[in-house]
């Protein structure tokens, strides 16, 4: 599932842990997600993680003023679908962020309106495999005329916590 439910489960070797962080500064919100592996990473962990990272980087490369939220969603979703995990990308690609954590515009197949210069959005593709685990990588991005600027500075390589 994209968002965990509290439980008494203890982390086990090979668990993915999705960590969604938020911040509030002078009335403006920030949002960031990173995923780590507990213990040892398998080739499957690396495969899933790298697909999600490739999807997010494709979205960051494509995002700019004038494209629609639907187009940006499709760019990220295509990477995951082409890798064979389209059915496991079960949420929208992102959302606007600012005075609220989740605000307009939605980065989803349903938003046919163009992104405007100086919007701040999240780009957060993910893969979630029932009974196994999931990965999401999320950054806040400032939309400019011909590009977007990621605002988060946290590394994106897969971290393994031993």
Ranges and model annotations:
Residues 1-162:
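Active-site neighborhoods and metal-handling regions in enzymes and metal-associated proteins
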């Amino acid at each position: 599932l994209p968002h965990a439910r509290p439980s008494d489960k203890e982390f086990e070797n090979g668990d993915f842990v999705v960590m969604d962080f938020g911040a509030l500064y002078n009335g403006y919100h920030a949002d960031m997600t990173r995923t780590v592996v507990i213990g040892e990473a398998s080739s499957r962990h690396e495969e899933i993680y790298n697909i999600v990272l490739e999807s997010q980087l494709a979205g960051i490369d494509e995002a700019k003023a004038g494209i629609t939220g639907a187009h940006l969603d499709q760019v990220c979703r295509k990477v995951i679908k082409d890798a064979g995990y389209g059915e496991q990308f079960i949420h929208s690609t992102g959302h606007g962020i600012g005075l609220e954590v989740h605000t307009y515009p939605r980065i989803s197949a349903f938003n046919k309106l163009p992104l405007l210069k100086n919007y701040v959005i999240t780009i957060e593709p993910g893969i979630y495999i029932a009974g196994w685990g999931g990965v999401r990588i999320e950054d806040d991005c400032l939309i400019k005329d011909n590009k977007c600027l990621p605002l988060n500075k946290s590394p994106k390589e897969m971290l393994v916590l031993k």
